[in-house]
């Protein structure tokens, strides 16, 4: 069943994956942005809304932490030094320990081509910066009540 987010391809948030009704066993979210202040600000927002959240600025640490901590969602910046969000999404999708996670691109790159690339590598949603926090919260809140999750 596809959730109705009231969004279209020109919106600041686009969701591609259908979400099946079920419940999430926890509300863990991993935020990854090489700009530490942005990651910390988003972490504070999510914690204030009742999520358990960790923020990373090192893209090279993402796959290991995601596999160990098992967040239900990973919010990734696209443009980062060393390893970009597109490659991180590919790696997270390729690993059975992380392939089930909700992947949200959070980026200033917002062209139709940018969104198509994000979708092609496995992102479930694309949020354009500057991010409308309420939109991201709507996606995560909907996912916590509408997405089946079982830790491997």
Question: Where are the regions a protein language model picked out?
Answer:
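Active-site beta3 strand of CheY-like receiver
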Residues: 69-75
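Short hydrophobic/Thr-rich beta-strand motif most characteristic of the beta2 strand and flanking loop
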Residues: 50-58, 62-65
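Two-component/phosphorelay signaling modules centered on CheY-like receiver
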Residues: 36-54
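A Lys-centered signature of the CheY-like receiver
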Residues: 129
